[in-house]
Structure formats: structure tokens, C-alpha cells
């Protein structure tokens, strides 16, 4: 493509030369360069550019280049839309005319292609038959698709481009609407429904765009009356085209647009326009199945014609009134349950839709059938209509004659059908349906039950299924109680007396109320009669009340007369002031609008003048620049033509765009050409080497490997295919033979039975006919008898049902009272059980706490007793080591710990605990009894050193007197006196606890009470303590007073020394260099080292371990800890 921009006349001359030699595409490119130039020469006049533009568009039409034509049209519009609008209009109209002519020629050519048939005797050639079977089209359709459709598409694109080109330009507004109407005619002519929808959407989008406020003065403004009128006329053409194409949705949208434009206009539309609007609107409503709004539109048309049309004739008035009357009578009766429609509608509620439709008709509220009939009476439509249709109104809305209703209506329908050109034929089916509904409603007021054949006889123009459908719709929409008995072929009306859902009185003739309606309104009627009776008994009461109210009103008027008079005067004054203010504001607003319009016109003229001056200056400047640029480009063109002679130069130029070429000089272009040539040569050599190696190795290896595999695969596949075919063929032959034999045998067997079947069927048919007639007669007689019997039984049954219902209610009341008493008793028992369980729990908790307290006291006594024994032994040893001549030791005084001297043990060695020996309790390891049969230790807290002399009456026991050891639940005194007063021990109650068998006094083998099986202690710890007690035992076992071995030697008493700090009281191993402060009371004064102590035994699992107790530190800081 040449980079040199030619002058328009030169380009046109060169294009004609290309056309002469048959190169139309080159001619179009030459003309396109003129319009594609970025430095456009605006100083050229339309006389020079217009011929170029016509030739350019002619070539675009010839080559079907609609997008290229669009580009040129946009450039031409930018040049002449403000300078010479006539030239732009001529160009666009010429372009569309050329496209339409070529489309018509293509249509004629397509029609001629189907006529030119070589052989008239053989119209359906094999090729045409195959094509129709493949694509489902005939020859004409295929011809249109190949010849006509491309030109139709081109014409459609041309219309769309022109509309987009002129949509916002106020100077071309008339041309825009003319093209829109041409597009409507195009859609009608070629039946392009989809394109018509797109065109409507495009026009609606353009209207929305011009409705927006625009700051540009040349744009279209919707506030202008001319613009509104043009848009209104275009929408009326759109509505007419949509109705002709039967696109009712687009017609409805067009009606909405028309109504919006009429509302936007300040002027009242012309009566002719409104008449056309109402006519089209009535047609759209009828096609949509909305008879109510169809009749409303016809009524509005009648009112408009009567008020605005001056020379209307009587025949025309009669025709219009008759049309309105028939359309109103054809409206279906209103539904008693319009709220049911809400469950069917999906997008908007019926009320909103009805309000929108009423808004299109200029109504304040939605119309109804009753309101339209009242409006007909008010406007004297009935008297102006034809006599036969006035009689139709009397039959359907006034008279009550169900037996002759359908006959009378059928006569009127026959008159309508007799005229084939009558416009009332479309209402015949709707009138029949309304008549059937009226018939059913009137029949229901006369009969309670009617036979279905009789009802069909009354409904002359309805068959069985249609009448059944009418009955179902009456129940669904008109709230009628109807039951169809298919077995008895009858219809029941108003059988449910307890149900009445419709409160408003149905319109139309009514003879009497239904029984359910009478039952429902019984109280209302009683109230009316009672009020009448009161008025008859006391007639002066209401009169006196009226006199009193009249006197009160006169008194209030006399008091407020002056005030009301002044208020009315003030109101009149305010109204006058308000009117004057509104008039003044309107005058000021009109003056302001007039001033603004004049200012706007002046500013537009001034802006237009400035724009023209600026454009002239810009043209002069660009003309000089273009001349210099053309000289430079001429030189560059010569250099580029030289480079184009080589292949490398052509590739280089393809890589560079126009901007880069314009920036480079000839030397730079030559350097780039050499560089590109070198790169291309190196790349080509590398590619050749790489491809040579790759192809050589790959092909050679592939063929060597695939040869044996392919041969083996082919051999195996041939063998398999042959075996498979043989098996399938043998199986198919066997199956076909077997099926053939079976079919022949079955055919022979059935042929023999055919005559017998015919004879038997005829004989059976004759016999059953007589039997059926006799049985039918008997059935009817039995049916009548059964009906009478069931009526009598129903009376007895209902009486019995009422009695049984009363008895059932009594029985249910008795059961309910018994059930309440039972529940109250169960609730009282439950409360009592909970109270007893709570008492037991509290008692068990007290017993447990008392046992723990006594155990702690016993351990404290045991510890102190052992300390005293050790002190006594040490004192005896010191006395033995002293010399005989020394002074005698003073006799130790009696104390509450030791008792009198006479109470000393006879065998102290037997009671003295062993030293430096760890003695197990026998609970977790072998004790003294198990190892050698020795007697267990006597130093438990139950038995002191003097316990073997308890029977002797000694008073020196280790027990403390008073209430120190007494628990709140002890059964007897814990302390016993000496001598004879001690008596039997009574402290062996269920709440005392002790050790094992070794804890019994010497010489007695009686085990302790708490070691017996099933004792209260074991029972308490195993049965009464649940899961919530395990946490308490676990916390007791985790105390800080369990000794260094963590309770591994239960039954022993450990001594904890004084702690240097808080950390010394912790259990577990001590750090190196620190002394262990824990000691066993059975060890001697010099305990073994930590490493010489015996190995700890593993603690066996035991749940019934009582909690330990800490008796507190002694005078040396040591604390005894008893482990169980």
C-alpha cells in the first residue's frame, strides 16, 4: 500500500483506471487511502469530495464491504455535518438506495434460479432430493440462502451503521427517523423478526441516550417539540410494523414508549394520533388475551371519537357502541379469589401489572367488568347499540331464564356468524363461555341436583368435555359449590351448607340466595329484623335523638359562626394570594425560559462562527504542513521502492509500521536491511543443521523399531478378525433360522383360531346386549330404592353420630382429668424420692467426714505414744548406765500420756517397736506374720503399751479424757475409766476404723470391724462413692504429705523434717548436696543413707485407700505422715 496520500481527484481518476481493468479491490484501496489519511485536508470542498465518496460507496456495495463503508461515512460526517448537511444526506440516501437495489436484484436472481430447470419432466433431480433430505429445505430456500441472504445481511448492516452515524446529531435528525422507517419496511419485506427486535432495542437505547442531559449544543434534545413529534411518529410506525409481523411483545414495548413520549410532551397529542393509539392498544390487549383492558381501550376510543370527531354519523356511532358493548359482555366473569394469581406469577404482582396497563389507558385505577357496565349505562351506550345486542345484554345481565338462555344467545351468535366480514366474530367464543357460566350460576339457584345430559341439553353450544371444564372453572374462579358425580351422571350444587367463602354478591341476575349464603347471613338478617322491631316499638326514640343532635348542632353553629366566617374569609384571601403568586412565578419562569432560549441561540451562533473561523485557520495551516509532508514522503517513497525490489527489504518493511518508517531516514533503513539479511542467513543455516540431524536420527531409529512390531500386529489382527467374523456369522444364521421357524408355527396356529374367534365374538356381543338392557333397568330401580334407603339411613346415622360425639367428648374429659391426677401423683412421688436421696447423701457425707476426722486424731495419738515410748526407753538406758552409788533417779511423775506406774507393761520388750528395720504393714508386701508367724506389732493407735492390762483396771492408758476424741456421731463414750468402771468397749461402732489383724490387742485374735467383708467402710468406698468421688481420692493421694516414695509403702508412718525453705516440702528426689528430710519412724536415730535404703515396691492399684492425715510438726520440727 502506498504511503503517499494523493489528492481526491487524482485518487478518483486512478480508481477508475483500476475499475476499467477489473481490479475493484485495488480501486477501493486507492480511495480508502484518501479517507484514512491522518492529516486530512479539510480545505477541500464537497464538490470535490462528494464524487469520490459516491464512487467509494459504490465499490463498497459492489464488494459487500460494509465495515469499510462505515469508516468512510464517519469521516464524511465529521467534515460536512455542520457545513453542508444536504451533501451528507445525499451521500447516505444514495448509499442505502444502492444497497436496496442490489438486494432486490439478488432476490430476483434467486427466484429465477429455481425456475431455470433443464428437464421439465424430471423436476426432482437426485441432487435436489439429496439436498432436501440433508438440510430440510426446498430449492427456493437454498437459493435464497446462497444468493439473497448475503445481500440482506449487507443491507441490514448498512441501516444499523447509518443509524449509529446520525443518532445524536440534531442537524440530521429527520434523516435519522427516515432511515429508521426504512429499516422497519426492510424487516417487513424480508420477514426478519430477529432483526426487528434488535432494531427496536437499538432505537430504545438511542432514545435513552438523548434523554440524558448533554452539554454539547449540536446534540439532539428531547425537550424540543419537533424532536418529540418525530420520535412519536417513528414509534407509531414501529407499533404498526410489530402488529403486522405479530410480534406482540415488541408492540407492547412500543406502546410504552409512545405513552412515555406523550406524557413527556407539554402539548396534547392530536385526536388522530390518540385514536390510532387506542386502536392499536386494543388490538394488542386482545392478542394478549386481556379482554378487560381490550374493552377499556375500545371505550376510551369511543369517548374520544364522540367528543373530538365532529362529522360522525349515526351508523358509525352505532357500530362503535355495538363493538364496545360486545367487547364488554365478552369479558370473563371476575374471579372470586384473585389472590391465587400471586402463586402463579413470577416477576411482578397482578396488581402492579394491572396498574401499569391502566396507566397506559390514562386511568387512575384498574378497571373491572362491573365498572365498565356502569360506564356503558352512564354514557348511554346501550341505547345507541344495535337492538339485538341490547337484547344480549338483557339476557346476560338482567333477565333470569336459564332454560332459554342458550337458545336466545345462539340466535344472536348465528347472526354474527352470518356476516363473514363482521368484526364481532372474534368475540363469539368468549360470549359462549360467559353464557355457560351464567347458565351454571342460574341453574345452581334453581336446582340442587341436575342430570348431566339435561345440563348438556340446556347448554346448546357446549360438548361434554367443554362443559365439564366450565364447571371446574366455576368452582376454581367463581367460588361455586359444584360436585360432578360421574357414576350417576349428575351435578350437585351447594351441597356443603357449612362453607361459604364469597361475601360479595355476584353480579348478574339472581333468583335467590344459595342455602350456604342464607346460613352465613342468618345473624345479619336477624339484626336487621331486630332493629326494625325496636323502631316499631319505640318510634319516638330516634326522633328525639335527632332533635337533640339538631339542637346541639345549632348551638355549636351559633358559638362558632363568627370564627368560621373569619376562617373562610382568610382561606379565600390565601387562595387569591396563592393564585397571584403562581401567576407571577409562571410569568417569571416563562420570561426566564425565553431569555435562556435567546441566550442559547445567540451562544450557538457565536460558537458556530468561532468554530468556522477556527476550521478555516486549521485548514490553511494543515495545507502548508501537508505540502511539506508530501515532498518528504515523495522522496521516502522513491527510496522505499528501491528497497522493495529485494525479498529482505520487503520483510523489513513488513515489520515496520508507518510511524517508524516516517521517523527513519534512508541510511538507517539500509543499515537495518543489511542487519536483517545477516540474521536471516545465520538463522537459516542453524535451522538446516538442526533439522538435518534431527530428521536423520529420528526417522532411522523409528523405522528400524516399528518394522517387526507392525508385521506382528498385522498378522495377529488378521487371525483375530477372521475368527470373530466366523463366530458372529454362525450365530446370526442360527438365530435367524430359529426365529423363522417359530414365526411360521405361530402364524399357522393363529390362522386356525381366526374363524372361531369371529363366531364367538358375534355370539357374545348379541347375548350381552339383551342382558345389559335388562340389568340397566334393574339397576335404575335399585338405584331409586337405594337412594330412599340411604336418605333414611343418613338421618339415623347423623343422629347417632351426634350422640356418639357427645359421649366421646365426655369420655375424653374423664380421661383428661384422670391423666392430670396421675401426673400430679407421679410428680409428688418423684419429689419425695429426690428428698430421701438427698438426705441419704448428706448423711453419708457426714459419716465420711467424721471417719476422716477420727482417723486423723488416731494417727496423732499414735505418733505421740511412740515418741513417749522412745523417751522412756532412753531414760531407762541412762539409769542402767549410771553407777550404783549415784543418786537415785527421781520417779517420773504421772501424766495423762503414761498413766500411773503400776500400769507399766509387764513385757516391754514385746511391745517395744523394732529399730532400724523397715516393717511393712502386710498390705503391699509380706509382713512379720507371713514371714515367720510372729505376732504383729502392737503399736497401732488403737492399742497402746498398756492395752494388755485393760482388764486389770489400770488407769494409766494413753487415752485423753474429755471431748477431745469424741465425734458428733459416736455411739458411746470413747474414754473409759480404770478398774472396774471401764467395762466393755463400746467404741466399736460402724464409724470407727483401724488397721489390719495386727492391730488387735495381744492375746486376742479378733479382727478389726473395718476389715470384715462387707463392712460399712468398704461398702461406703466401693458402692456409695461414684465417679465424682474418684477425683477427691485422686486429690488426696496427690497431697504434699505422702512422703518421698509417693505412697509406695502404705501402712507406714513417715516423718518429715523441718524445711529450710518452701521447696524442701516437695516430694520426689532431692538435688545433689542436699539432705533428704524424710524419715521412717521405724528406723533408728541414725538412718541409713539414701543409697542403702531398700528398693521401693511398686504400688498396686487399689481404690479403697483412705486419705492420709497430717498431725502437724512436733517440737523438733518433724511431721508424721500416715499412709494407707
UniProtKB/Swiss-Prot annotation:
Biased composition (Low complexity): 900-910
Tagged with keyword rRNA-binding: no
Coiled coil: 96-124
Region listing for Disordered, in residue ranges: 812-1124
Any single GO BP term: translation reinitiation
A Gene Ontology molecular function term of the record: translation initiation factor activity
Cross-referenced InterPro entries: EIF3A (IPR027512), eIF3a_PCI_TPR-like (IPR054711), PCI_dom (IPR000717)
UniProt keyword Coiled coil present: yes
This protein's UniProt keywords: Coiled coil, Cytoplasm, Initiation factor, Protein biosynthesis, RNA-binding
Biased composition (Basic and acidic residues): 812-851, 860-883, 928-952, 960-990, 1007-1048, 1063-1100
Subcellular location: Cytoplasm
Subunit structure: Component of the eukaryotic translation initiation factor 3 (eIF-3) complex.
Family: Belongs to the eIF-3 subunit A family.
HAMAP family cross-referenced by the UniProt entry: eIF3a
PANTHER family on file: EUKARYOTIC TRANSLATION INITIATION FACTOR 3 SUBUNIT A, EUKARYOTIC TRANSLATION INITIATION FACTOR 3, THETA SUBUNIT
Protein name from the UniProt record: Eukaryotic translation initiation factor 3 subunit A
Organism: Anopheles gambiae (African malaria mosquito)
Amino acid at each position: 500500500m502506498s504511503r503517499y496520500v494523493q489528492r481526491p481527484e487524482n485518487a478518483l481518476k486512478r480508481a477508475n483506471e483500476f475499475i476499467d481493468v477489473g481490479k475493484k479491490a485495488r480501486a477501493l484501496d486507492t480511495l480508502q487511502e484518501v479517507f484514512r489519511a491522518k492529516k486530512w485536508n479539510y480545505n477541500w470542498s464537497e464538490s470535490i469530495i462528494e464524487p469520490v465518496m459516491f464512487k467509494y460507496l459504490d465499490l463498497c456495495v459492489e464488494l459487500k464491504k460494509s465495515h469499510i463503508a462505515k469508516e468512510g461515512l464517519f469521516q464524511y460526517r465529521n467534515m460536512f455535518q455542520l457545513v453542508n448537511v444536504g451533501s451528507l444526506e445525499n451521500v447516505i440516501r444514495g448509499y442505502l438506495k444502492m444497497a436496496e437495489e442490489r438486494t432486490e436484484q439478488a432476490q430476483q436472481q434467486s427466484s429465477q434460479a429455481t425456475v431455470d430447470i433443464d428437464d421439465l419432466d424430471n423436476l426432482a433431480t437426485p441432487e435436489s432430493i439429496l439436498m432436501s433430505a440433508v438440510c430440510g429445505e426446498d430449492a427456493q430456500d437454498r437459493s435464497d440462502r446462497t444468493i439473497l441472504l448475503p445481500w440482506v445481511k449487507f443491507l441490514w448492516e448498512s441501516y444499523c451503521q447509518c443509524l449509529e452515524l446520525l443518532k445524536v446529531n440534531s442537524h440530521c435528525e429527520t434523516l435519522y427517523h427516515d432511515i429508521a422507517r426504512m429499516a422497519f419496511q426492510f424487516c417487513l419485506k424480508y420477514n426478519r423478526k430477529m432483526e426487528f427486535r434488535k432494531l427496536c432495542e437499538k432505537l430504545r437505547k438511542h432514545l435513552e441516550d438523548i434523554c440524558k442531559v448533554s452539554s454539547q449544543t449540536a446534540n439532539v434534545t428531547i425537550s424540543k417539540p419537533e424532536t418529540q413529534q418525530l420520535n412519536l411518529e417513528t414509534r407509531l410506525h414501529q407499533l404498526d410494523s410489530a402488529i403486522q409481523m405479530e410480534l406482540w411483545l415488541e408492540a407492547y414495548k412500543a406502546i410504552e414508549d409512545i405513552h412515555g413520549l406523550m406524557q413527556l410532551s407539554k402539548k396534547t397529542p392530536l385526536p388522530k394520533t390518540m385514536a390510532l393509539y387506542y386502536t392499536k392498544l386494543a388490538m394488542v390487549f386482545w392478542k394478549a388475551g386481556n379482554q378487560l383492558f381490550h374493552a377499556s381501550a375500545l371505550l376510551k376510543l369511543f369517548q374520544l371519537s364522540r367528543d373530538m370527531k365532529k362529522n360522525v354519523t349515526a351508523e358509525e356511532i352505532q357500530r362503535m357502541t355495538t363493538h364496545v358493548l360486545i367487547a364488554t359482555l365478552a369479558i370473563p366473569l371476575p374471579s372470586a379469589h384473585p389472590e391465587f394469581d400471586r402463586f402463579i406469577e413470577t416477576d411482578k404482582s397482578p396488581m402492579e401489572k394491572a396498574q401499569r396497563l391502566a396507566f397506559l389507558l390514562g386511568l387512575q385505577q384498574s378497571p373491572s367488568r362491573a365498572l365498565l357496565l356502569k360506564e356503558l349505562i352512564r354514557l348511554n351506550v346501550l341505547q345507541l347499540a344495535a337492538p339485538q345486542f341490547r337484547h344480549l345484554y338483557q339476557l346476560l345481565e338482567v333477565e333470569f331464564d336459564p332454560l332459554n338462555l342458550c337458545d336466545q344467545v345462539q340466535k344472536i351468535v348465528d347472526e354474527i356468524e352470518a356476516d363473514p366480514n363482521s368484526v364481532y366474530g372474534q368475540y363469539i367464543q368468549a360470549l359462549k363461555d360467559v353464557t355457560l357460566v351464567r347458565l351454571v350460576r342460574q341453574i345452581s339457584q334453581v336446582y340442587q341436583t341436575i342430570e348431566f345430559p339435561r345440563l348438556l341439553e340446556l347448554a346448546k353450544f357446549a360438548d361434554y368435555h367443554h362443559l365439564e371444564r366450565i364447571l371446574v372453572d366455576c368452582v376454581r374462579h367463581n367460588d361455586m359449590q359444584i360436585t360432578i358425580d360421574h357414576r350417576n351422571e349428575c351435578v350437585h350444587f351447594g351441597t356443603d351448607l357449612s362453607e361459604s367463602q364469597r361475601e360479595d354478591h355476584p353480579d348478574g341476575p339472581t333468583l335467590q340466595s344459595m342455602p350456604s349464603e342464607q346460613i352465613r347471613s342468618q345473624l345479619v338478617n336477624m339484626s336487621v329484623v331486630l332493629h326494625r322491631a325496636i323502631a316499631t316499638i319505640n318510634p319516638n326514640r330516634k326522633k328525639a335523638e335527632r332533635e337533640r343532635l339538631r339542637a346541639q348542632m345549632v348551638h355549636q353553629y351559633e358559638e362558632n359562626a363568627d370564627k368560621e366566617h373569619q376562617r373562610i374569609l382568610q382561606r379565600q384571601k390565601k387562595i387569591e394570594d396563592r393564585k397571584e403568586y403562581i401567576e407571577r412565578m409562571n410569568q417569571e419562569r416563562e420570561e426566564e425560559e425565553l431569555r435562556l432560549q435567546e441566550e442559547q441561540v445567540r451562544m450557538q451562533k457565536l460558537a458556530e462562527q468561532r468554530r468556522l473561523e477556527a476550521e478555516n485557520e486549521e485548514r490553511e495551516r494543515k495545507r502548508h504542513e501537508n505540502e511539506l509532508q508530501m515532498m518528504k514522503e515523495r522522496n521516502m517513497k522513491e527510496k522505499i521502492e528501491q528497497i522493495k525490489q529485494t525479498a529482505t527489504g520487503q520483510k523489513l518493511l513488513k515489520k515496520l509500521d508507518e510511524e517508524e518508517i516516517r521517523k527513519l531516514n534512508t541510511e538507517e533503513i539500509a543499515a537495518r536491511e543489511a542487519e536483517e539479511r545477516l540474521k536471516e542467513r545465520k538463522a537459516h543455516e542453524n535451522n538446516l543443521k538442526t533439522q538435518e540431524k534431527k530428521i536423520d536420527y529420528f526417522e532411522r531409529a523409528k523405522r528400524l523399531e516399528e518394522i517387526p512390531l507392525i508385521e506382528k500386529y498385522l498378522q495377529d489382527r488378521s487371525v483375530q478378525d477372521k475368527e470373530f467374523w466366523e463366530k458372529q456369522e454362525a450365530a446370526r444364521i442360527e438365530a435367524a433360522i430359529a426365529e423363522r421357524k417359530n414365526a411360521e408355527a405361530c402364524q399357522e396356529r393363529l390362522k386356525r383360531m381366526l374363524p372361531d374367534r369371529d363366531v364367538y365374538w358375534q355370539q357374545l356381543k348379541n347375548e350381552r346386549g339383551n342382558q345389559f338392557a335388562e340389568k340397566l333397568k334393574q339397576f335404575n330401580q335399585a338405584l331409586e330404592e337405594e337412594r330412599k334407603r340411604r336418605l333414611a339411613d343418613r338421618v339415623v346415622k347423623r343422629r347417632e353420630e351426634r350422640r356418639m360425639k357427645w359421649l366421646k367428648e365426655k369420655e375424653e374429659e374423664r380421661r383428661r382429668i384422670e391423666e392430670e391426677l396421675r401426673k400430679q401423683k407421679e410428680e409428688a412421688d418423684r419429689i419425695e424420692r429426690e428428698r430421701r436421696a438427698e438426705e441419704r447423701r448428706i448423711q453419708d457425707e457426714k459419716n465420711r467426714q467424721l471417719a476422716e476426722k477420727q482417723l486423723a486424731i488416731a494417727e496423732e495419738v499414735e505418733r505421740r505414744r511412740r515418741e513417749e515410748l522412745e523417751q522412756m526407753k532412753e531414760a531407762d538406758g541412762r539409769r542402767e548406765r549410771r553407777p550404783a552409788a549415784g543418786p537415785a533417779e527421781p520417779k517420773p511423775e504421772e501424766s495423762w500420756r503414761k498413766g500411773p506406774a503400776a500400769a507399766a507393761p509387764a513385757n516391754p520388750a514385746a511391745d517395744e517397736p523394732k529399730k532400724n528395720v523397715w516393717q511393712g504393714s502386710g498390705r503391699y508386701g509380706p509382713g512379720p506374720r507371713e514371714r515367720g508367724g510372729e505376732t504383729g506389732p502392737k503399736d497401732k493407735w488403737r492399742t497402746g503399751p498398756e492395752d494388755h492390762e485393760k482388764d486389770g483396771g489400770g488407769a494409766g492408758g494413753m487415752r485423753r479424757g474429755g471431748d477431745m476424741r469424741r465425734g458428733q456421731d459416736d455411739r458411746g463414750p470413747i474414754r473409759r475409766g480404770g478398774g472396774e468402771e471401764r467395762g466393755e468397749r463400746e467404741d466399736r461402732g460402724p464409724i470407727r476404723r483401724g488397721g489390719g489383724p495386727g492391730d488387735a490387742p495381744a492375746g486376742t485374735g479378733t479382727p478389726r470391724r473395718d476389715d470384715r467383708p462387707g463392712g460399712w467402710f468398704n461398702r461406703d468406698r466401693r458402692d456409695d462413692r461414684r465417679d465424682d468421688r474418684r477425683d477427691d481420692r485422686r486429690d488426696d493421694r496427690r497431697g504434699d504429705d505422702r512422703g518421698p516414695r509417693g505412697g509406695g509403702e502404705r501402712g507406714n508412718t513417715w516423718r518429715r523434717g523441718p524445711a529450710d525453705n518452701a521447696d524442701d516440702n516437695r516430694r520426689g528426689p532431692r538435688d545433689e548436696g542436699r539432705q533428704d528430710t524424710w524419715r521412717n519412724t521405724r528406723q533408728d536415730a541414725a538412718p541409713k543413707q539414701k543409697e542403702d535404703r531398700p528398693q521401693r515396691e511398686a504400688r498396686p492399684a487399689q481404690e479403697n485407700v483412705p486419705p492420709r492425715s497430717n498431725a502437724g510438726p512436733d517440737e523438733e520440727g518433724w511431721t508424721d505422715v500416715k499412709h494407707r
